[in-house]
Amino acid sequence: MGRKWANIVAKKTAKDGANSKVYAKFGVEIYVAAKKGDPDPESNSALKFVIDRAKQAQVPKHIIDKAIDKAKGNTDETFTEGRYEGFGPNGSMLIVDTLTSNVNRTAANVRAAFGKNGGNMGASGSVSYLFDNKGVIVFGGEDADAVFEQLLEADVDVDDVEAQEGTITVYTAPTDLHKAIVALRESGIEEFQVTELEMIPQSEVELSGEALETFEKLYSVLEDDEDVQKIYTNVDGF
């Protein structure tokens, strides 16, 4: 699958650490997970999963606690998940996942972001068929074979395990991501750099020059939208 997760994680963490918008987005995601189930992460696996991801992105504890406290209250604010697909310059493609309290606003904003920044919105499924839905786990380690065997023994549907420069990357079936995390924790792994459900491109494109500048602007505008939770792309390095 060829993605250099260690480098991508380092870039993302450096950016996320200084980005209050990321904190706000995680706040919404934590609120939704806590509202749907028990506000205690020890009895709500979906909430625990989101909190773990928030910690990986260096979201402060008070942001996490505030979102959980909000879910415990009497607020009836509701959020709806959405997915948009589209195209950028020179064969670049994007999948945009959203979580919003106003679907019409979000749809208009995403469409405008594509239209005003060198992209084109596509129909549902126009891009996603060229991506594979996988669970991705990244942590420090060297022995990919041993990790693969541990996961098989735990009856995890694991697709691949890669070792690169002191980092292990595990790819699982999306339905087995949680099972894999539990199995790895039971084997002694305490800290993860990434625990995500990802849409991984079947092939990547490299952009340079004006095409790269156009794509970066499109990506940045989408990322800055408060309703956009995740962006998947086939552009190398993103």
Swiss-Prot record:
Task: Please state where this protein is localized.
Answer: Cytoplasm
Source domain of life = Bacteria
A molecular function (GO) term: DNA binding
Q: Which GO terms describe its biological process?
A: regulation of DNA-templated transcription
Per the record, what is one GO cellular component? cytosol
Keywords linked to the UniProt accession: Cytoplasm, DNA-binding, Transcription, Transcription regulation
Keyword Transcription regulation attached: yes
Q: Which family does it belong to?
A: Belongs to the TACO1 family. YeeN subfamily.
Protein name in UniProt: Probable transcriptional regulatory protein SPH_2064
Q: What organism does the UniProt record list as the source?
A: Streptococcus pneumoniae (strain Hungary19A-6)
